């Protein structure tokens, strides 16, 4: 598969593809560091140094997409899971557009997990394999319907085997029940976890308001959650994320 074909498979926007294909090939001795967990910081720094200047992160994006093709050569799951997993790149450049009004890539610190074959998109959810547990992540485009979540969980169990599943997310916040209707899908999602260790969390600004740099007063009010969370913050409250252990038979 060529890089252009790969970009088409993951539905990367044409404007981004043009920028990606203009970046020269990055040496394999640098790319291999991006898919080696203990070398992630070193690899990212080396790639950035090799590609300077790198306006809006397109150089790093191109390098990571080149690396993804190397990952594909030894990928342990199906082509479908590989492509769905790597669509994270498309999701992130579109989120950059939503946040800042232009395409860009600023999630290279995260996508090395996908490149290293330790984080997979299986249906609606992502699963990251670590030594002591399987860490569950919720992509921004996940549909939190019980049937879809159950299918994702069952498929993940079949592929990844037994092991405790845990999650750390703003979606598990103990503050959300006071901000959402009882029928909310987010609250239904929460009920599948034993929730513990709430702590202050700023990432909610990115996920709910699409821009982490806005002041409380400037936060948008386009959705009911945005309006309620903005009022919560303006009242001087601190929003918390939390950790959770997935129940044995979730998403019923």
Q: Model-derived features: where do they sit?
A:
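Non-catalytic substrate-recognition and accessory regions of acyl/acetyltransferase enzymes
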Residues: 1-144, 161-164, 175-252
């Amino acid at each position: 598969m060529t890089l252009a074909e790969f970009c088409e498979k993951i539905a990367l926007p044409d404007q981004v593809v043009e920028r990606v294909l203009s970046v020269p090939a990055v040496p394999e001795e640098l790319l291999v560091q991006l898919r080696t967990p203990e070398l992630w910081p070193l690899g990212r720094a080396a790639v950035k140094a090799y590609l300077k200047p790198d306006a809006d992160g397109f150089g790093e994006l191109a390098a990571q997409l080149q690396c993804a093709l190397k990952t594909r050569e030894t990928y342990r799951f199906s082509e479908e899971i590989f492509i769905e997993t790597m669509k994270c790149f498309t999701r992130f450049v579109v989120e950059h557009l939503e946040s800042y009004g232009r395409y860009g890539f600023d999630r290279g610190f995260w996508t090395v997990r996908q490149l290293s074959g330790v984080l997979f998109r299986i249906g609606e959810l992502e699963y990251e394999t670590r030594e002591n547990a399987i860490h569950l992540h919720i992509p921004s485009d996940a549909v939190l319907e019980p049937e879809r979540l159950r299918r994702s969980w069952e498929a993940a169990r079949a592929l990844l085997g037994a092991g405790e599943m845990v999650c750390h997310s703003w979606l598990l916040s103990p503050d959300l029940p006071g901000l959402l209707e009882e029928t909310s899908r987010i609250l239904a999602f929460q009920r599948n976890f034993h929730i513990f260790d709430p702590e202050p969390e700023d990432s909610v600004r990115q996920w709910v308001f699409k821009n982490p740099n806005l002041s409380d007063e400037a936060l948008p009010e386009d959705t009911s959650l945005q309006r309620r969370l903005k009022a919560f913050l303006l009242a001087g409250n601190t929003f918390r994320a939390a950790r959770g252990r997935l129940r044995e038979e979730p998403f019923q």
